[in-house]
Amino acid sequence: MSSPSKPTSPFVDDIEHESGSASNGLSSMSPFDDSFQFEKPSSAHGNIEVAKTGGSVLKRQSKPMKDISTPDLSKVTFDGIDDYSNDNDINDDDELNGKKTEIHEHENEVDDDLHSFQATPMPNTGGFEDVELDNNEGSNNDSQADHKLKRVRFGTRRNKSGRIDINRSKTLKWAKKNFHNAIDEFSTKEDSLENSALQNRSDELRTVYYNLPLPEDMLDEDGLPLAVYPRNKIRTTKYTPLTFFPKNILFQFHNFANIYFLILLILGAFQIFGVTNPGFASVPLIVIVIITAIKDGIEDSRRTVLDLEVNNTRTHILSGVKNENVAVDNVSLWRRFKKANTRALIKIFEYFSENLTAAGREKKLQKKREELRRKRNSRSFGPRGSLDSIGSYRMSADFGRPSLDYENLNQTMSQANRYNDGENLVDRTLQPNPECRFAKDYWKNVKVGDIVRVHNNDEIPADMILLSTSDVDGACYVETKNLDGETNLKVRQSLKCSKIIKSSRDITRTKFWVESEGPHANLYSYQGNFKWQDTQNGNIRNEPVNINNLLLRGCTLRNTKWAMGMVIFTGDDTKIMINAGVTPTKKSRISRELNFSVILNFVLLFILCFTAGIVNGVYYKQKPRSRDYFEFGTIGGSASTNGFVSFWVAVILYQSLVPISLYISVEIIKTAQAIFIYTDVLLYNAKLDYPCTPKSWNISDDLGQIEYIFSDKTGTLTQNVMEFKKCTINGVSYGRAYTEALAGLRKRQGVDVESEGRREKEEIAKDRETMIDELRSMSDNTQFCPEDLTFVSKEIVEDLKGSSGDHQQKCCEHFLLALALCHSVLVEPNKDDPKKLDIKAQSPDESALVSTARQLGYSFVGSSKSGLIVEIQGVQKEFQVLNVLEFNSSRKRMSCIIKIPGSTPKDEPKALLICKGADSVIYSRLDRTQNDATLLEKTALHLEEYATEGLRTLCLAQRELTWSEYERWVKTYDVAAASVTNREEELDKVTDVIERELILLGGTAIEDRLQDGVPDSIALLAEAGIKLWVLTGDKVETAINIGFSCNVLNNDMELLVVKASGEDVEEFGSDPIQVVNNLVTKYLREKFGMSGSEEELKEAKREHGLPQGNFAVIIDGDALKVALNGEEMRRKFLLLCKNCKAVLCCRVSPAQKAAVVKLVKKTLDVMTLAIGDGSNDVAMIQSADVGVGIAGEEGRQAVMCSDYAIGQFRYVTRLVLVHGKWCYKRLAEMIPQFFYKNVIFTLSLFWYGIYNNFDGSYLFEYTYLTFYNLAFTSVPVILLAVLDQDVSDTVSMLVPQLYRVGILRKEWNQTKFLWYMLDGVYQSVICFFFPYLAYHKNMVVTENGLGLDHRYFVGVFVTAIAVTSCNFYVFMEQYRWDWFCGLFICLSLAVFYGWTGIWTSSSSSNEFYKGAARVFAQPAYWAVLFVGVLFCLLPRFTIDCIRKIFYPKDIEIVREMWLRGDFDLYPQGYDPTDPSRPRINEIRPLTDFKEPISLDTHFDGVSHSQETIVTEEIPMSILNGEQGSRKGYRVSTTLERRDQLSPVTTTNNLPRRSMASARGNKLRTSLDRTREEMLANHQLDTRYSVERARASLDLPGINHAETLLSQRSRDR
C-alpha cells in the first residue's frame, strides 16, 4: 500500500495499471497502484472526484485527460516527419533557415505583452524560430492559463478573480497562515544568504510538474500552488535609490562610536550645555558620515550595475505552455511606474555612456562584436563541434561522445545507458501545441518548471536538469569557472529518456514530473528522480537524476550549439547563490584589543567628567564663594542639578579623549596597506599573470603576528603537476628518475647531490633520446609528442617489442590498455594542430597516466556512443563501456567495466572490470589464489622503493566476470543508483561487492614536484619563529620524504609516531582510543617530562619561543580522529605538538584540517595562517585567522574563499616577513600615537577647568577643537601607519628573526598603550602650565597697551605647543625619515598657522578677532613655544637615547648595520626564495662593528644588555661570507656541519618490528628472501631501498612491502 505522505501522480483518468519500475526514496503515489480507486463523488464535492488511497483522501479534477494508450507508432506521422534519428530534420534553427523572411514578419509584430504575439507554425517543421519578446514582469500570456494567478507580494494578494486586495495587514496575516511564514520580503539579502548557506535544506523535497496539473494536495483553497519558490531575480545590493539615504545612515549608526558622538551633538544643540557653535561642532561627524556614505554608495553602485546586467540578461524560455508550479505575477500600477522609470533612467544612462564617451563607444562596439561572434560560433558547432576535426580518423557519426565528469561525484551514467531508444518521453500520439515556441526573455522571469534553451557561450540562468542538447548523444560541455574557479571544461549528460527532444514541438508532446531534493550548498552532489508514464504499457517509469545531469547557474555552455533543460532551482535556491555567503567575516587582533583601549579612555573620560560635575556642584552650593556661571544656575536651583548639567558639559568638552576619526583612519590605513600588497611586483606570478590579491583588507596587521602556519602539501608545497616516472609490471620495474625527494634522501646520507644529480640527469637524457627513436620506429603513433614524455625507460619499449618474451609483452600491453581505458578524461583538438588531441582531465594524476599510455602507443582519442576509442599502435579500436564506478575519497579507487564480445556470435560475452586505486586498497582486494606470491612481493618492494623516493603510487588490477554475474550485479547497482536518499552509501556498498578477487596488473609512480623556493621559504619561516604544520591527505611515507626535501624535517629530528593500530602498538592495547592516549602520554613523559595537565597547558600558552627539543610528530588520520576527541586527549596532543619543531598530519580529511587549526588557535591563543590550493582546503582556510589561497592546478575555490590569494607558496614568506611585519609595526605605533595626541589636547582643557571651577568654558577657540584631529595632527600619524619601515624588505628577508617581535606581541600591548597615555598626561601639563605661568598675571602688554590674558589667546599658546610637539613626536618615533614625511609635518604646522591667521582676520571670529596678529607678533610667544616643545620631547628623547645606547633592541642593531651599508651588496628587493635571484659570492666582512649581536634561536626582538651580547651565527656569518655551503643567501641559526650518514647498502639495518604472530614471521621470512634475490639481481636500488627515518615506531601508513602483503593476507 502506498504511503499517504508521498506525492500523488498527475495522471487521473486511468484507474488500474500495473506499477512501473521501482525506485527508492521519492516514489510517487501512483493512480496506477492497485490500492488507488475512485469513489463516487458526493454532492458536497460538486464536480470534484475524490480518490482514496491508504486512508487519505485526495482531490482530483474530474476533467479527464486524453487517452494515453500507446498506438502503433509505426503508422503515425506528424507534419511529414517520420524519422526522429536525424537531428537536422527536427532542429528549430536548421529547419527554418529557408523561412527567415516569414519569421521576421512575425518578429516585427511582437508587442511588449505576450497577448499580442501571434505566429503560425511552418509546415514540415519542428517548431518556431526563437522570437525576442520584450516581456516585462507584468506581461501575461492568455495561452498559458485559463485564469490569472497572482503571486503573493507585500500589499498585493492573489485571487482567482484577479481582484487585488489592498489591505496590507490582512494580506500579511493571510500569507503567514497559508505559507507558514514563508515570506522573505521583510528579511535583508544578507540574512537570507547567511541562512541559506548555513542550513542544509536538502531534506526539503520538491516535486515539479511539466505539462501536467498539480495534485490537489499541492494546491491551496483557491487552487493556487502551495509551494512558493524564490524569484530568479537576484539582488546583492544593500540599497536602492530610495532607500540609500535612510538605510545607510541607519547602518552607520549601528557603530557605537557614531552613536556616542551623535548624542553629544544633540546635547550640544541645547544652549544650557554651553556649546558655542553647535553647527560647527557637527562638522567632523558629518564629514565622516559623508565619506563613509560615498564609499558605500560607490561599492553598492557596482553591485547594482552587475545585478542589472545579470537580471536583464536574455535567455530562451518556452512559451505557450502553462507552468502549473508557480503563480503568475500580478504587478501593480505603482510597481509598473517605478520599473518604467528605472528602465528609462538606465536607457538614458546607457545612451549617454555609449555615445558620448570614447570608452562607451568602444564598449558598445565590443558588445556587437561579441554578439556576432556568439552567433557565428553558435552556427559553427554541430552535433559534436569540439570533435569535428577528428574526421580524419574516419570514425562513424556517433564518434566523439565525451566521458562524464567524475571528480567528487558519486553518481553514475550507467543507468541512463539502460534505456532503449523507444523508451523516451515523446508521446507521438499527442498533437504539438502550435503556440509553443522558445522566446527571448529576461533571466529574472525564469521560474521553476520552465523549459529553457541555452545557446553556445551563454551562461546558465538557473539550476536546471539537462533534457537534451544539439549533440546526438545528449552531451554538452560546460565551463564552471564562475562556480568553483576551475577553467577546464566539464561534460554534462542529458537524461537518456529525453535526449531525443530536439524542438519545441517535441517538448510539448511530453508529460513528466521531477522529484528533487531540496537546495543545498554542495556543488558536487544532487539527487532526484525523473518520472513519466510509459506510452507503451502505462507504467510509471523512473530515471535517476544526478549532478552529471544538472546545469548549474553561473556555468557557461561551451562547444555545444544548444542545450535544453527544465528549471529546478531559481534565485537564492541555486547553488551559486547559496555558496555566496559562506566566507566568514574576520577581524584583526589589534582591532579586537582596541576595544579595551577605548573602554579605558571611556573610564578616564567618566572620571574627568564626574570630577568636573562634583567640583562645580560643590562650588555652586557655596554661594558666597561662587558665581552663577550659566543662565541655568538660577533655573536649576540646586547643587545636584548644577553638577548633573556640568557633568554633561564636561562630556561634550572632553569628547576628543575618544577620537571620532580613529576608526575611519584605521580603515584608510588598512586600505592603503592592501593596495601596497596588491601592487608589489615581487609578489606577482608572471606565469599565471596573478598578483597577490588581498580579499580581506582589514586583517593586514595579523600577517605580522603569525606563529603557526598550516599548509597543505599537494599543490601547495608541491606543484600539483604530475609526471609519470616509474611503473612496475609483472614484477619488473621500469623507469629512471632523479627526484627531489631522492636528492633530499641522498643528501641526508652525506652524498654530494649536486654532482650525483648532474650525472644522473645526463644519463636520463641519453636514455630519453634512445627511447624516442625506438618509439618512432615501433609504430605510427599519431598522438606521439616527445615534448610531453616524462617516463624514461628504453626497457619497456624493448619489452613491448617482445624482447623479454611473449608473456612480458602481453603483461605490458594489458597494463597500458588498462591505463587508456580506466579514466575519466576528455580529449579536444589542439587549437594549433587539430590532428593532435589535448587531454582535459579532472585531476593531474589521471592526465599523467593517460598521457604516458599515449606516448607508448595506447592513445585514448575519444568516445563513441557506446564506449571509448583507443588507438593501439596506430590502429583504432572501440571498447564498449558498461559502467564507470567513480573515484571518491572513501573508496580510494575507481573502476570501469568493459564488455568483451564472445569469440563467436553465439558465445556469451564477458565483462572485464579494471580497477585502479591506492596500493593498500588494491592489495587488500586481490584474490589470494590467482595471484603469484612472488610477483606480489616484487611489486610490493618496487612500490616501497617508489614511495621512498617521494613518488605517489597507484596499483592497477582487473577481474573477469561472466555475463550472468554482471547482469545479476547490475540489477542491484541500478536500484542503488535510482535511490534518492543515501544514494552514495548504497552505491559504495554495491561497488564494494564487485571490486573483489582482483588480479594484479602492476603499479605506477608519479612525481609531484616541489614548488620553486619551497625549501628556502620554510627555512626562513622557521628562523622567524613560525611553526609549520603540514596537513595532507597523502600517505605518510610520501609526506615524510617531501618533508625532508623541503626542510620541514631534518636528519637530526626524532620522529614521534602516533597511530591508532598496528603490530608495533599492540603493547598499548587494542582499543584505538587507548592506544593513542597511551602513546601520547608516553611521549610527553619520556621526551618532555610532562603529564598533560591544565597547568602545563597554561604555561605553554605563555611560551612563544621555539621548542628546545629536536622532535617531530607524525600522525595519521585515524589517530588524529582519536586525538581530537575529548578535552583531555586534545590537551595532551596539543602539548606534544607544541614541544615539537614539526608536525605532519597525514591522511586527514578537510574537516580534520579545520579542527586542527581551531584547536591550536583557540586553545593556545595564537595567530594562525592556513594556506592551500584546493577545495579540500577551504574549511582550513576559513578557520584560520588568515587564510591564503594559491591559484594552482586544482581550481580557484580556495582562492575565492581566502583572505589573500598568491601564485606560489614562496610568496607567503614575503607576504608575512615583509608586509606583515611592516603593517603590524605601523598600526601598532599609530594607534597609541592617536590616543596620545588627544590626551594632550583634552587634558589641557581639564587643567584649565581647575581655575574656573569646571564651569565648561573653552580654553581654545572652538574651531581648534574641530580641526585639531581633522587637519592639524592627523596626516603625520596616517603617513606613519602607511609609509614607515623599520628596515628594508631585503633586510627583512635576510634577517627573518626580526619577525619574532610580532609573535611575542612586543609592538602592541596595553602596557605600551598606558605608557603613551602617561606621556600624554605629562606633556599636557607642559602645554597648559607653561603659557599659564607666563600670562596668568597679565605681565605681557602689547604695543597698543592691550594684554594677552584672554583665554582664546592663551589657547593659541597651548594649541601651538600641543600641535608642534605631537607632530615632532610622531616624526621622532618613525624609523623612516625622508623628505616626504618631513614635508607633511611642515604642512600640518602651516595649516595651523594659516588657519589661525585667516580665521582671526574675519570679524566672524568675534572674540578671537585679530588674535593671530596680537599673539604671533610677541617674541614671548616664540620663546614659550620653543621651551614648551623642548620640555615635552626632551624626556622621551633622552630615555630613547639611553635605551638605544646601553640596552639596544635587535632591530636597532640590525638597522645600524643596514644604515652602515653592510647589506648593500644585496640588490633592492632581494628574495632568498626566488630561484632566479642573483648569487652573492663576495660580502665585505664586518671589522669595525663595536659589538657583535645576538640573533640566535633565543632571539626575541627585545632589548639586550651589553653583557648578554655575544658573537654568534647570524647575521655575522652572512656578513663574513661563511655561507658557501648555504648558497650565500639563507639566514640560518645553525651553521655547524651536520653529521653525515654513511650510505646503507645492506639489509642488516632494517628497523626491528614487533611481529607478534606466526603469520607475520612467515611473511617476513619470505619477503626478506625475495628482497635479497632482487638486490642480488640489481632489481632494487641499494641507495635507498632500506633507508628509514629515525622514528619512535614504524611509521603509520607507510606501505612497506610487508605492510601491503599483510593486508592481502588478512581474511576479508
From Swiss-Prot:
Changing residue 386 to D: No apparent gain of activity. Disruption phenotype: Decreases phosphatidylcholine and glucosylceramide transport into cell. Simultaneous knockout of DNF2 leads to abnormal endocytosis and abnormal cell surface exposure of phosphatidylethanolamine, phosphatidylcholine and phosphatidylserine. Simultaneous knockout of DNF2 results in cold sensitivity, and sensitivity to cobalt, nickel, zinc, calcium, and magnesium ions, duramycin and cinnamycin (phosphatidylethanolamine-binding cytotoxins) and papuamide A (phosphatidylserine-binding cytotoxin). Residues 272-279, 631-635 are annotated as: Involved in phosphatidylcholine substrate selection. It is found in: Cell membrane. Its cofactor is Mg(2+). Changing residue 396 to D: No apparent gain of activity. The record marks 660 as: Involved in the release of the transported lipid into the cytosolic leaflet. Residues 20-30 have a biased composition (Low complexity). It is a multi-pass membrane protein. Phosphatidylcholine flippase activity is inhibited by glucosylsphingosine, lactosylsphingosine, lysophosphatidylcholine and to a lesser degree sphingosine-1-phosphate and lysosphingomyelin. Glucosylceramide flippase activity is inhibited by lysophosphatidylcholine, glucosylsphingosine and to a lesser degree lactosylsphingosine whereas lysosphingomyelin has a stimulatory effect at low concentrations. Changing residue 386 to A: Loss of activity. Pfam families: Cation_ATPase, PhoLip_ATPase_C, PhoLip_ATPase_N. The chain crosses the membrane at residues 253-273, 278-298, 599-619, 640-660, 1232-1252, 1263-1283, 1314-1334, 1351-1371, 1378-1398, 1419-1439. A 1,2-diacyl-sn-glycero-3-phospho-L-serine binds at residue 1436. The active site is at 712 (4-aspartylphosphate intermediate). The modification Phosphothreonine is found at residues 70, 782. Residues 274-277, 620-639, 1253-1262, 1335-1350, 1399-1418 are extracellular. One of its GO terms (molecular function) is phosphatidylserine flippase activity. Keywords: ATP-binding, Cell membrane, Isopeptide bond, Lipid transport, Magnesium, Membrane, Metal-binding, Nucleotide-binding, Phosphoprotein, Protein transport, Translocase, Transmembrane, Transmembrane helix, Transport, Ubl conjugation. The modification Phosphoserine is found at residues 85, 389, 392, 396, 403, 1542, 1592. It catalyses: ATP + H2O + phospholipidSide 1 = ADP + phosphate + phospholipidSide 2; a 1,2-diacyl-sn-glycero-3-phosphoethanolamine(out) + ATP + H2O = a 1,2-diacyl-sn-glycero-3-phosphoethanolamine(in) + ADP + phosphate + H(+); a 1,2-diacyl-sn-glycero-3-phosphocholine(out) + ATP + H2O = a 1,2-diacyl-sn-glycero-3-phosphocholine(in) + ADP + phosphate + H(+); a beta-D-glucosyl-(1<->1')-N-acylsphing-4-enine(out) + ATP + H2O = a beta-D-glucosyl-(1<->1')-N-acylsphing-4-enine(in) + ADP + phosphate + H(+). Residues 1-252, 299-598, 661-1231, 1284-1313, 1372-1377, 1440-1612 are cytoplasmic. Changing residue 655 to N: Decreases phosphatidylcholine import into cells, but does not apparently affect glucosylceramide transport. Changing residue 1566 to A: Loss of activity. Its main location: membrane. This is Phospholipid-transporting ATPase DNF2. It comes from Saccharomyces cerevisiae (strain ATCC 204508 / S288c) (Baker's yeast).
